[in-house]
Amino acid sequence: MTTANPFAQRSGLEYELPPFALIKEEHYLPAFYEGCTAQLAEVQAILDTPGAATFENTIVALETSGQYLMRMLLVFYNKSSSDTNDALDAIEEEMAPKLAAHQDAINLNPVLFKRIKDLYEARESIGLNSEDSWLLERYYKDLIHAGAHLTQAQRDRLKELNEELSKLETQFSKNILADTNDLAVLVETVEELDGLSENEIAAASSVANDRGHEGKWLIGMVNFTGNPVLDSLTNRELRKKIMEASLLKANRTNENDNKPVLLKMVKLRAERARLFGKETHAEHVIAVQTAQHPDNVHAMLRKIAPAAVRNAQAEADDLKKSAGTDIESWDWGFYTEKVRLEKYNIDTTKMRPYFELERVLHDGVFFAASKLFGITFKERPDLVTYHPEARAFEVNNEDGTKVGLFIADFYTRDSKRGGAWMNNLVDQNFLFKQLPVVVNNLNIPKPPAGKPTLLTYDEITTLFHEFGHAIHGFLSQVKYPRVSGTSVQRDFVEFPSQVNEMWILWPEVVENYARHHETNEKLPQEWIDNLNAARTFNEGHATTSYLAAATLDLAWHSLNSEEAAKVTDVEAFEAQAIKDYGLDFAPVPTRYRSTYFSHIFAGGYSSGYYGYIWSEVLDADTVDWFKENGGLKRENGEHFKNTLLGRGGSIDSMQMFRNFRGRDSKIEPLLKRRGLV
C-alpha cells in the first residue's frame, strides 16, 4: 500500500475533511483496489483470531475494518453525484460490480457468519450494554438479509446477481443524466418565455450560451415529471413541449433508453428474492423495514388513494373553470397558480423577492436549528471543498465546542444529478472520535453574476427538508459508525427531515427570513396567513402524483420470477399498475415514470418509495407534539435530540419514536394535514 494516495490515511485536517486539494481522479481506482485488499486482510485477521469469538474481537474489529476503502467511497460517490464527468463515469462503471463482489466476499463468508451467529445466540449472557447488543443484532440480521445463511450454490448465484445488478444500476443512472441533458428544450425567441421572471429568463439564456446556442434560451429538465417553469409560462404550446420532453426521459429507444435496463433489473431482483426464500423483492426488502410486510404498505396506501384522487378531481374542476377548457398535465401548474391567487391572494412570483437564498439559509434554516438545538453556524471559506460552489460552515454548540461541518452545494449544473439529497463525507462516531461532515445538494438554478438567488416556495421546502437530514447527521451521538446519524430504516429516515419543514411558516422563523432582498420589508402578514390557509390547496394533485409513483414501485417489485419474465411492455405495465389503484387520472401523471425513477432503480429505494408517506405519519404526529408543547423551544429540541435524533440507528426505530412521543404513532394527523378526512 502506498502512502502517496491521499485516501490511504486520515486527512489530519479539521473535522477530518477529505484533502480535496490533493485528490485527483487517478487516485480513486488505486485507493479502491488497495482499500478492498486491506479490508479483506483485516477480516481475515478476525477469522484467524484464536479462541472463541467475542464482541471486541469480532464486532468491534469489523467496525474498525475498511477505513481506507470507506474514505475513498464517501468522497467518490459524493463527487460522482454532484460533479461527474466521463472519467468518473468510467471509474464508477468499473468499480460498481467489483464493490458488490467485495461486499459479498465479506457478507457471505460462512466462517464470519458462524462467529457472529454464535455471539448473537449468546447475547444475553455476554454482558453487553444496550448499544452493543443492538449493534450485534444489526450485524446478525443484516448478514441474514444479505444471504449469509444460504447454501454455497445459492451464495455463488447471489454473488452473480449482485454484480450484474450493480452494473445495471450504474447504467440506469448514467442513461438518465445523458438523456436529461439532451432533452433540454431550446427556445428561439424571448417572447415565448412570457411569464418567467427576469432572473429565470437570464438563467435560461446563460445555459443556452454555455451549450453553444448563443442568442437563444434553454429550458433544462428536472429529475421528476414536469418542470417548475410550467407554473408561470403563459405559452401553452411551449408548456406542452416541456411536459412531453420530461415524460420521455430515458424512454426514446436510443442508446440512453432505460426500458431494457429496468426490465432486466426487475427479473434479477425477483430471482434474488427467491434465493432468500421470499416470493418477491418487495417482500424481502420490506421485511427489515418498520412496515415489515408489503401487505401493511398496500393497506395504508389503499386507505389514502381514493380520497386523494377525489380531491385531485375536485381541484381539476376548479382549474377548468379558471381556464375555460379541459385541463391537461402541462396546464395544471399554470392554472393552479391562477386559482391560488384567486382563492388565497397568493402570487408566488411576487413572493420570490422575499425569499433570497442567503437570508433563507442564515435567518431561516440556521436560525430555527439554533433556537431548537443551541447550535451556531459560521462559514469557513478557507476550507477547500470538492467544488467552488460547495461552501463549508462549521457547526458549534453555544459553548463553542465543535459539532461538525456542513457543506452546502445548492446550484444546479450539467454535471450534477437531479433532485436534492444529503450525504456524509465523515460519519459521526466515538469509536474513531470523529465529528460529522454532512453535505446537502440541491438543484437551484444559478442566477447571472451579480443577481440574487430568489427561491420558490418549493425550493424553500426542499432546503428545510434536506437540512432536516443534515441535523439528523449532526446531532448523532453514537459510538459506532454503522449506526451513525441517518443509518436507520428507509421508511423511517425521511421522518426527521419532514419534521424540519414545519418551521418554514412558524411565525418566529418566517418573519426572520422572509424579507424583501432590496428593501428589507417583511413578507406581508396577510400573505403568510394566506400561505397557512392554503396548506391543503393542491394536496389532491400532490398526493395522487406521489401515490402513483409509490404504487408503481411496489408493482414492479411485487412480481415473482415467472411474472417478471412475462413483462415486455414497460408503458403498458406502468399504466395498468396505476389503474389498479384507481390513480389513473390523466391530468395528474405519476411523479416519476419508470425510466427515470432513480430512487428505485439506482438510488437504494427499491420497494421503499412508500417510505415518504409512511414516515409522514410519524412526522405529522410529531408536528402536533411540538405545537402542543410550545413549538420552537430549546427544551423541545433537546427532547427530540436526546430521545431520537441523537440516537442514530443505535436502537429500534419505532422504540425511539415511542420514547419521544410517549406512545405509538397515529395516522389521523396525516389525514388531516393532506385534506383526506
Where in the sequence are the language-model features?
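Short, hydrophobic/aliphatic alpha-helical segments
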Residues: 258-270, 437-440, 478, 647-649
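Active-site-proximal, well-structured secondary-structure segments within enzyme catalytic domains
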Residues: 131, 135-137, 159, 164-170, ...
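Short pre-active-site segment immediately N-terminal to the catalytic Zn-binding motif
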Residues: 445-464
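Short small-residue beta-strand/loop micro-motif enriched in glycine and branched aliphatics
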Residues: 228-229, 293-294, 417, 448-452, ...
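Short His/Asp/Glu-rich catalytic/ion-coordination signatures at enzyme active sites or charged loops
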Residues: 12-27, 75-95, 119-160, 220-260, ...
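C-terminal, non-catalytic "cap/extension" segments appended to globular domains
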Residues: 2-30, 34, 216, 344, ...
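N-terminal helix-rich structural modules
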Residues: 2-196, 626
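Intrinsically disordered or highly flexible coil/loop and linker segments, enriched in small
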Residues: 37, 41, 45-52, 68-82, ...
